Structure formats: C-alpha cells, structure tokens
Regions:
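Non-catalytic nucleic-acid substrate-recognition regions in nucleic-acid-modifying enzymes
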Residues: 1-132, 392, 475
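Short, charged/polar, Gly/Pro-enriched secondary-structure boundary elements
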Residues: 39-46, 154-157, 371
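A short, flexible beta-alpha/helix-coil linker loop
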Residues: 95-98, 154-155, 300-304
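SAM-dependent Rossmann-like transferase core, predominantly class I methyltransferases
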Residues: 147-181
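Conserved S-adenosyl-L-methionine
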Residues: 170-288, 303, 311-313
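C-terminal catalytic and target-recognition region of SAM-dependent MTase-like enzymes
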Residues: 281-397
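Basic Arg/Gly/Lys-rich low-complexity intrinsically disordered segments
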Residues: 323, 357, 364-476
C-alpha cells in the first residue's frame, strides 16, 4: 500500500506507520510505501496524522504511450474493483518525460473501464467528480504505470472538525507534521499566539491525548468497497484504549476577534474545550508563561493576509520570544528568508516544507536568557572561571612581592652606573648630558660620518655626493 503526504513530511509519516506495526516501510517522494492487511488499511485511515491518502495498488505494468496504457487496462478485470451500477472518478499523477498530459491519461483510463463494461454487460458505470463510489488513482513514474484504489475518498487532511475558518487556514496534515517534528508529546503547555481558526491547537490536543484524527470524518471510500468489513471497522473506530490523560493547557490567542470565534467553534466541534484556552490578545500583550512551554505559530506571509509592515511584525516576534519566553522552545513556519532575518534569533532547526503552492521554511528556536549559548558552553565557562580565581590569587601574590622589591630599592641612594668597559669612567647625570651634547654636535657636522672609511674622514666629505643627490632629484 501507499500513503501519500506533503513534501517534507515523509519521515514523520514513516515513523507513524512503524508505530502502527506496518511492514516494509519505505520512504519515497511525497509518499511512503508499506505492507499490511485490511486491518492495517483501516487503521492507517483512522490514525495517521500526516497522511493525505491511503492507496491500494491493484495492477502495475510498463507502457511507453497512452495507447499502451489503454490496451493494458482494457484487458484488466474491472469487476474486481467496481460494478456497473457504481460511480467513479479518476485522479492521475505523472512523473515522466514520456507522458506530458496527466489529464489525457485519466481520459484513456476512463475509456478502458467504460469499454470493458459496455462489451461485457452492455452498460457502463457513470463518472461523478464529487463524492464518487469508487475513486481510482493512476500513478506514472517514467514508464511504470500503477492503478490503485483510493481507500480514503476525501483527503485525510479534512478531519471533520472544522466548521468555521479564517482567511488562509493551515492544512491539518501540515500542522500535525510540524508538531510531530517539533517533538510535541503533551508534556508541557503549548502556546499559539497567532492561532487563527485553531488548527495548531486542535492537532496539538489530539496528539497530547492520542486521539485518532479520523474519528470526526463522515466516512471513508473503503466503506463502499465490495469487501468492506463493518465489524472490523467498528471495532477499530470505537477502540479508545490508547488514549491518555493530558495534564497541561494549550493556549491560543489572536488579535482578531473573528479568528478566535472561529477557533472556539472548531474546538467545541472537536470536543476539546477542556484542554484549550482561547483569548483575543495580541502577541505583545501575552504574559510570560509560568512554566516551560512550546510555542508554535504560522504568522502572516503577506501573500493572502496583508500586513502593512512585515518587517515590524517579524521583528516584534523576535523581541517577544527573546524577552518573554526564556526557557521555552519556538517553532515558526514562514515563507520568505527575510522574515526569519527580521526575527533575529539563531535557529536550532531548519527545513523546507510546502504550504499549499508556497515553499516555506520551518525553523525551531531554543530560547535562552541573554545570549544564546548552549548549556555545555556555559558549563565550560563556569569551570574556567573557577580555575581563574586560583590563578588570580597567584598573580596577586607575585605582584605583591614585586611591589615590595621595588619599594626596598631607594632610588636616591642608588649607586651610580658603572660601565662594564674598563676605559669608561663612572657616569653621572652631568656626564651623560655632556656626552649627549657632544654626540649631537658630531652628527650636525658630519651626518655621514658613520658610513665613511677612516681615510675619507681625514679628507672630509666627498665632493661628488651632492651631485649624486642632485641627479637623483632630477630623475624624480
């Protein structure tokens, strides 16, 4: 089977499938393949938080043209997946240089199905784009074609608890994936200071209480399959043995009253009001949390929700995180790199995620008092400081001894300096001044004396020297 997901959530989905005890879990591009029975198929639809669809492959073959696809599907026994009285729709996904038009592949698949039933029974199933009985999926990778049954029907991100929404609501699968990547397990409080219609809040409560996200849905496509087992499904649907108690609080706030009203309606529909506290409050006015908490937020990008000054918004976020949430962790989904630059904090986690058609980034921050230093660095500096105290004491002892030695030498009674050369007399301050004046007079009379031989000194300066200097000046 195949579980489809959003770009960047494949690793989280694989972890979820492993926890469900699925076999042969393999990560692919926006999908994770696995093996399992009918029970696993039902569980995957009910309990996976980061899956969009669960597909059950029925036939795989190779083809180079759309005509080959038609011929192979024309020979397939369609009665194993659909009857002539049912409705259907076809979704196609293509990753191939040989096939450019995914919609045309859907048309050719429909032709093969209709021609099969018309030749066999004289009647054909009807196409219904909205809520069909059977949803088919054609996946083309290079020249490999796979026909699958879509067991989910509507995308699994449509949980069923959303009865109200705001502009640009966050995808439920994406929200759950971000929380799982952040390591949310319900062991602390959680805060969303820009909660919108409450997607993060509800998904966080479902994870904390380990409530299956699929219990709010009206149904799944596999319930209309010929081999549907209602007893098995009812057993799994009503099994709440894995649910747990959540002892913390999830706080949600927003500056817009209508957003908080929408969030409250959705929270009530999900039956999670006892875990979630809502308020109309800008982020600047949120009080400091009483204990360690996790912050998660999806601020406006400036695309669909217009904000007058994006730089000011994200700068404010960074300032509030730094000064109000020390000891907490924060996870932010944003669209443009400059948004994070305005936050001005060093991230501990960074990766790309898709929010609809927008390529966004998720960044995580560990918030510390003052500078962002790791505990190991702080411990190292503390140890060095303790050792430095001992070193400073030693230096003070040495300095104190040096000061005593300096004071013990009376400069006024110090004997005159005696040159190590035997032909030099004792030097007093008057002698040193006289020697210095004589040296200056010699330098004035013969500036080049020190560079001349003894013969030249007797004759005086060379006459050609001034000419040589003049030539040099002319050349310059």
């Amino acid at each position: 089977m195949v579980a489809k997901t959003l770009y960047g959530l494949e690793d989280v989905l694989a972890t979820e499938l492993t926890a469900l005890e699925a076999e042969e879990v393999t990560v692919g591009r926006r999908m994770v393949s696995f093996r399992g029975d009918k029970r696993m198929l039902y569980l995957a639809n009910l309990r996976l938080r980061t899956a969009l669809r669960i597909l059950k492959p029925v036939i795989t073959f190779h083809a180079k043209t759309t005509d080959e696809i038609y011929e192979r599907l024309r020979l397939f026994d369609w009665t194993t997946v659909i009857s002539s009285d049912q409705t259907f729709s076809i979704d196609s996904v293509v990753y191939s240089d040989s096939f450019k038009n995914s919609q045309y592949i859907s048309y050719r698949t429909k032709d093969a199905l209709v021609d099969f039933f018309r030749d066999r029974e004289g009647k054909r199933p009807s196409v219904r784009l909205s809520n069909p009985d059977i949803l088919l999926n054609i996946h083309v990778s290079h020249e490999e074609v796979t026909l699958s049954l879509d067991s989910s029907g509507e995308s699994l991100h449509k949980r069923g608890y959303r009865v109200a929404e705001t502009t640009a609501p966050l995808n439920e699968v994406l929200a759950a994936g971000i929380l799982l990547k952040a390591g949310w397990d319900g062991n602390t409080d959680l805060i969303d200071p820009m909660c919108g219609s409450g997607t993060f809040l509800i998904e966080a409560a479902l994870i904390a209480c380990n409530i299956a996200p699929g219990i709010y849905r009206r149904g799944f496509a596999f319930q209309r399959w010929a081999d549907f087992d209602p007893d098995l499904y009812d057993e799994l649907f009503h099994d709440d043995s894995a649910e747990r108690v959540f002892d913390h609080i999830i706080y949600g706030s927003d500056i817009l009253p209508q957003a908080v009203a929408a969030a409250r309606s959705n929270v009530e529909r999900a039956g999670l009001g006892r875990y979630i506290s809502l308020s109309v409050l800008p982020m600047q006015q949120r009080p400091k949390p009483e204990s360690k908490a996790m912050l998660v937020m999806n601020p406006p990008y400036g695309e669909r929700i217009k904000v007058e000054d994006m730089q000011q918004l994200y700068t404010m976020i960074g300032e509030r995180l730094k000064h109000n949430y020390a000891g907490c962790s924060a996870w932010i989904l944003a669209f443009k790199p400059e948004h994070f630059n305005h936050i001005g904090l060093r991230q501990s986690h960074r990766e790309k995620l898709m929010n609809g058609a927008l390529e966004c980034e998720l960044r995580g921050y560990e918030l510390f008092e003052g500078r962002r230093d790791s505990f190991a660095e702080r411990k190292s500096r503390r140890a060095e400081g303790e050792q430095g105290v001992g070193r400073r004491i030693d230096r003070r002892d040495v300095s104190a001894g040096r000061e005593k030695r300096s004071n013990s030498m009376d400069r006024e009674n110090k004997p005159p300096y005696r040159s190590p050369r035997p032909d030099k007399p004792f030097r007093t301050s008057d002698n040193r001044k006289k020697e210095h004046n004589d040296e200056q007079q010699r330098e004035t009379r013969w500036p080049n004396d020190r560079f001349r031989s003894s013969d030249e000194s007797e004759r005086g300066p060379r006459k050609s020297s001034s000419k040589r200097i003049q030539v040099i000046r002319n050349d310059e």
